[in-house]
């Protein structure tokens, strides 16, 4: 569009601004990043106004990272507070329509980059602000008036962040007494499909969106005012499994929106057909097989988990709209759900959290589990985690003894089978065994590799066993 110094089109969704092509970074893991939408009476809004508090783009140094907050005020006859989260989540959409401007995450985790090419064409955030507001009013016509304030001053961003956190907390509390079984309709969201094409985000009363920005009430409000938008109703259909949270209606939508890649999603399962993970999730869950437990790491945590991996590495393994068994992306508010990974033990399966996350969700953790979940202050690796869990008598420790007994029983069974099979392989005197191709086998006592699969699902379409012939 000629009135703006950069191109605007949905084709730029998914565009990444790499570090080498970046002019400045706003928010992200090295600083503070915030976006917030507030509904206001129309007489309190100056339509189209852009205010900048702190250094403008022309005052910034190339390659630097700056704190960032975007506060949008919106008004209209149909605009109400219930729509704030819905409008807010579209910020991600519309900013990514702008060429050379990358936007990731949401709420208090915003991460943006302005490319060198785009920065060379504009010296202020004002045209950027006007472009985003133009897109909002075009795509969401119920918004009649809109203004925005950009904050790049550290003290001001900190102030806005503190106020916003209270607003987010109040929003999240609305679904506390509403549960999956109380409603007939869930809601879906496809906002992240530009980055994760097969992601199917399902929002139920007991499961907030992966980004944490959309709860069940937000989905309902969005589908009502924008029926053709990215949030839509899902008839939950027949309850197939109450423990895992499997519904026929969700499975149908999963198959359709993933183009057939997935045929089921179980809302409260960690291992079996888990919810897909996009890339905007607030927390990554990861299985630790050595202790048969699950750890969780949040986006803000900069250290390493006991498995030796950080958030960014595990997020790369988890995201992309896939079902990755052993990893799971979630929104922070899901920790407060009474159905939190209930198919796989719930809080009794959680063994590790970063201390900052543990403090943040303290009210969600059952009292009898608080001192049994380790943090980076307690353990540094798998061995120290094992020791900690034993000392605290964590529920997963009871599973270790059961697993050891299973392994012993399996070994005994293998020995019995081998002993029974041995006489059968000895030919009777004078009897000539027919010649058969030799097939080398490995036994537990003769070296080689032993593989033990537990709770594994293996599908083999076809197996061919043939004799390996020596080359002459």
UniProtKB/Swiss-Prot annotation:
Effect seen on changing residue 278 to S: Loss of ability to bind nickel; loss of activity
Classification via Gene3D superfamilies: Bifunctional carbon monoxide dehydrogenase/acetyl-coa synthase(codh/acs), Chain M, domain 3 (3.30.1650.10), Bifunctional carbon monoxide dehydrogenase/acetyl-coa synthase(codh/acs), Chain M, domain 5 (3.40.1470.10), Carbon monoxide dehydrogenase alpha subunit. Chain D, domain 4 (3.40.970.20)
EC numbers listed for it are: 2.3.1.169
Q: Which Pfam families does this one have?
A: ACS_CODH_B_C, CdhC
Alphabetic keyword roster: Acyltransferase, Iron, Iron-sulfur, Metal-binding, Methanogenesis, Nickel, Transferase
Q: Which reaction does it catalyse?
A: Co(I)-[corrinoid Fe-S protein] + acetyl-CoA + H(+) = methyl-Co(III)-[corrinoid Fe-S protein] + CO + CoA
Where does the source fall among the domains of life? Archaea
- Bound how, and how many: what does the cofactor note say? Binds 1 [Ni-Fe-S] cluster.
Q: Which GO terms describe its biological process?
A: acetyl-CoA metabolic process; methanogenesis, from acetate
Q: Which residues bind [Ni-Fe-S] cluster?
A: 189, 192, 278, 280
Q: How does it assemble?
A: Monomer. The ACDS complex is made up of alpha, epsilon, beta, gamma and delta chains with a probable stoichiometry of (alpha(2)epsilon(2))(4)-beta(8)-(gamma(1)delta(1))(8) (Potential).
Specify the protein name.
Acetyl-CoA decarbonylase/synthase complex subunit beta 2
Source organism (scientific name):
Methanosarcina thermophila
Source lineage: Archaea, Methanobacteriati, Methanobacteriota, Stenosarchaea group, Methanomicrobia
Q: What is this protein's gene name? A: cdhC2
């Amino acid at each position: 569009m000629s009135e703006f110094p950069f191109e605007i089109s949905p084709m730029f969704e998914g565009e990444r601004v790499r570090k080498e092509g970046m002019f400045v970074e706003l928010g992200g893991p090295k600083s503070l990043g915030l976006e917030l939408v507030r509904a206001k009476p129309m007489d309190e809004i100056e339509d189209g106004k852009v205010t900048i508090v702190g250094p403008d783009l022309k005052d910034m140094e190339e390659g630097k990272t700056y704190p960032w907050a975007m506060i949008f005020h919106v008004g209209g006859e149909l605009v109400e507070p219930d729509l704030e989260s819905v409008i807010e989540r579209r910020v991600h959409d519309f900013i990514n329509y702008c060429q050379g401007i990358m936007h990731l995450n949401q709420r208090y985790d915003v991460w943006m980059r302005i490319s060198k090419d785009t920065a060379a064409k504009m010296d202020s955030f004002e045209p950027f602000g006007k472009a985003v507001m133009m897109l909002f009013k075009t795509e969401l016509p119920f918004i009649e008036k809109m203004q925005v304030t950009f904050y790049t001053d550290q003290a001001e961003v900190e102030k806005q962040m503190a106020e916003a956190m209270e607003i987010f907390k109040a929003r999240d509390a609305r679904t506390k007494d509403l549960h999956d079984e109380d409603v007939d309709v869930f809601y879906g969201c496809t906002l992240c499909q530009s980055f994760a094409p097969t992601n199917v985000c399902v929002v139920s009363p007991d499961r907030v969106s992966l980004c944490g920005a959309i709860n069940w009430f937000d989905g309902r409000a969005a589908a009502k005012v924008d029926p053709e938008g990215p949030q839509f109703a899902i008839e939950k259909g027949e309850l197939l499994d109450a423990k895992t949270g499997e519904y026929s209606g969700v499975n149908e939508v999963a198959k359709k929106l993933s183009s057939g890649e997935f045929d089921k999603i179980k809302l409260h399962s960690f291992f079996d057909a888990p919810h897909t993970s996009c890339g905007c999730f607030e927390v990554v869950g990861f299985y630790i097989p050595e202790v048969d437990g699950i750890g969780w790491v949040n986006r803000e945590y900069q250290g390493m988990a006991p498995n030796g991996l950080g958030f960014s590495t595990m997020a790369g393994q988890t995201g992309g709209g896939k079902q990755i068994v052993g990893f799971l992306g979630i929104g922070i508010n899901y920790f407060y759900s009474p159905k939190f990974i209930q198919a796989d033990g719930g809080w009794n399966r959680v063994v590790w959290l970063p201390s900052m996350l543990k403090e943040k969700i303290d009210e969600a953790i059952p009292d009898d589990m608080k001192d049994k979940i380790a943090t980076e202050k307690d353990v540094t690796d798998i061995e120290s985690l094992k020791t900690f869990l034993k000392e605290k008598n964590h529920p997963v420790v009871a599973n270790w003894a059961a697993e050891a007994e299973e392994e012993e029983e399996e070994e005994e069974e293998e020995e019995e089978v081998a002993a029974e099979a041995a006489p059968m392989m000895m030919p009777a005197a004078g009897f000539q065994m027919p010649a058969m191709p030799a097939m080398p086998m490995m036994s537990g006592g003769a070296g080689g590799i032993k593989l033990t699969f537990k709770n594994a699902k293996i599908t083999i379409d076809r197996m061919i066993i043939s004799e390996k012939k020596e080359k002459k």
